[in-house]
Amino acid sequence: MNLALGILEKRGFLKQCTNLEALSVLMDREKMVFYVGVDATSTSLHIGHLIPFMAMAHLQRQGHIPIALVGGGTTKIGDPSGKDVMRKILPKEDIEANVKAIKEQLLRIIDFSHGYIIDNSEWLDNINYIEFLRDIGVYFSVNRMLGFETYKRRLKDGLSFIEFNYQLLQSYDFYMLNKLKNCKLQIGGDDQWGNIVSGVDLVKRKLGTEVFGLTLPLITRSDGKKMGKSEKGAVYLDSKLYSVYDFYQYFRNVPDLDVKKFLYLFTFLEDDEIEHISSFQGYLLNKAKETLAFEITKIVHGESAALKASSAASAAFKGGEGDKSDIPFFKLALTSLEGTILLVDLMVSSKIVSSKSEARRLISSGGVYVDKVRIGDQNYCLNKDSFANGAIELRIGKKKILRIIL
């Protein structure tokens, strides 16, 4: 197998390929131009998007040429893959703002001095519908399209005609990138298999060129929790939507069984180092988790931000001397302390828990600390004297901490 593809396989990135043997031979002969597409449905990517772009980075490190295709055009349609209902159609202005924000995030992850970032609205916005149907639609079989899982599932719940067109547009993207940049490989999540295969087929039938599609596995957690979701919602790459500290802590607190897998997927550490640190047992495995959290935070937010997050976590949970300013905080109104405030009420209002019953249960079980003092009384109250230093630290167990400031 080609060296670059071997790296992807070793690190857990390979799921399906249209013709792995032929792709491997071609990648041994030439520097492959390849692309990953992402629609601009949000102002930020989330960690689920990291998998294809980490694969992109590994291929680029082996000399291959990446294209990040941001879907300013396809977002106006909406991909039905993995969705039970039609996506909300965004205003043009929102899509343009999202495209700009996503491009800025990608520039932190991929070196595009040796690659491209392209917005597919460059060609999709100018399509003549009649010509598109005659030139492109003729190559698509409705019967075949309905055989793909995305459409089969959605037909039961309702599939709009606008969504049904999405596969044609994504296939057209591959066709255009092959014409413009000699792109011969599309990489995407496994839910994109139908769209990718259709693009491969279109390029071959329209241009007579063999191109390839490669999909990546759906990443899961061993504890059954959905990857990329936290108690605070989606784990975004934008620090304004999901703080750098919380991002660091998300990876610091992954299940023990996932540490090795995530080190391979979310870092650029060498195999030997990953095998070594993931072999740690007991409390020593925390060192591997800290390495994982630091490395992926460095990739997404930069080394300086990763160091600050690591320092803040050390100060919060190990009693270190790090800067605590990066620890999440909740600002409490002074009027709330005119008398006293129940700790249970403060826990709910600060959203460190979702309900009073959860707060009481945690207090009763001995899992709640105020300034490192365990609180066992469900009726425990705080007043102005509690905030003599202007803030308190509220901690639940070993993983969740919040500064309450005045």
UniProtKB/Swiss-Prot annotation:
Gene Ontology MF annotations: ATP binding; RNA binding; tyrosine-tRNA ligase activity
Location of the motif 'KMSKS' region: 226-230
Domain of life of the native organism: Bacteria
Residues at which L-tyrosine binds: 35, 166, 170
Domain spans labelled S4 RNA-binding: 341-405
Alphabetical list of InterPro entries matching this protein: aa-tRNA-synth_Ic, Rossmann-like_a/b/a_fold, S4_RNA-bd, S4_RNA-bd_sf, SYY-like_C, Tyr-tRNA-ligase, Tyr-tRNA-ligase_bac-type, Tyr-tRNA-ligase_bac_1
Protein's UniProt keywords contain 4Fe-4S: no
Annotated keywords: Aminoacyl-tRNA synthetase, ATP-binding, Cytoplasm, Ligase, Nucleotide-binding, Protein biosynthesis, RNA-binding
EC numbers: 6.1.1.1
GO biological process, one term: tyrosyl-tRNA aminoacylation
General function of this protein: Catalyzes the attachment of tyrosine to tRNA(Tyr) in a two-step reaction: tyrosine is first activated by ATP to form Tyr-AMP and then transferred to the acceptor end of tRNA(Tyr).
Recorded family membership: Belongs to the class-I aminoacyl-tRNA synthetase family. TyrS type 1 subfamily.
This protein's name: Tyrosine--tRNA ligase
The species this protein was found in: Borrelia hermsii (strain HS1 / DAH)
Biological classification of the source: Bacteria, Pseudomonadati, Spirochaetota, Spirochaetia, Spirochaetales
Underlying gene: tyrS
